[in-house]
Amino acid sequence: HLDPIDHGMFFESGQATKITCSFPVPGTTNPLSEIERAWREGRAEVDIVPQGTLIERIRSAGAGVPAFYTPTGVGTPVAEGKEHRDFDGRTYLLETALSADYALIRAQKADTRGNLQYTGTSRAFNPAMATAAKVTIVEVDEIVEVGGIDPERVETLSTYVNRIVQREAGDPLP
């Protein structure tokens, strides 16, 4: 059994001061996560976003779309401070694209150019993150020659990958 990754280590070390996420704390029974502690002490800004809105903000950044409207979050604390607009009798919130300086992602396989193939839940956010970041660093289990990934299985093009790091054999997944 592996313990869940607690991203609070980045706040504890001072490497991060803001987090935009759907679930800012690990699924543990610890009394207070480091992210919560940093937020309560004023050392961190926490922006909680519904998961569907979060992935659409990331995808929009990768596609060059600066903003979009969504009905998700209307009438909740998520809507506070955001522009509201009615379309056909329904209220929507304006959400802005979310880009990153760096994306640290994981894939099953990369070819030597950086084309990526994923398995499982890695497909959920990693392809979008690669397109939305200035620099994408990917950790992979295997690096193959160009042509070693079936073209139908390439899920992120090498255009979006800047660095490849191969996981050591036997290294347990986090």
Language-model features: where?
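Conserved alpha/beta enzyme-core scaffold
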Residues: H1-P174
